[in-house]
Amino acid sequence: MTDSEKSATIKVTDASFATDVLSSNKPVLVDFWATWCGPCKMVAPVLEEIATERATDLTVAKLDVDTNPETARNFQVVSIPTLILFKDGQPVKRIVGAKGKAALLRELSDVVPNLN
């Protein structure tokens, strides 16, 4: 991605997690990932699509577990990619492993209406 391209996802860190995720008015899907993780790279474009298409219903955030180990540890993330959906500051759904767009939307739709 070049500097001129704007990502639809937001980058969160250990320092910004409480503000960007836990205090959000919208549900936030956090992608716990790492630069060296092949499956993480496969799911990244799917998450960008969801972030763009469902921006009114959902925020998609990315947290690099190598540079932000505290948050990953706090939520017991042991495998990546792990996606955790937060609603009203609480984790309400955990999805481990790379999944396609339709499967992700289906899994999230029971918590976030309007995703199907």
Curated annotation (Swiss-Prot):
It holds the Pfam family Thioredoxin. GO terms for molecular function: disulfide oxidoreductase activity; electron transfer activity; glutathione disulfide oxidoreductase activity; protein-disulfide reductase activity. Disulfide bonds join 37-40. Residues 2-113 form the Thioredoxin domain. PANTHER family: GEO12009P1. Belongs to the thioredoxin family. This is Thioredoxin. It comes from Mycobacterium tuberculosis (strain ATCC 25618 / H37Rv).
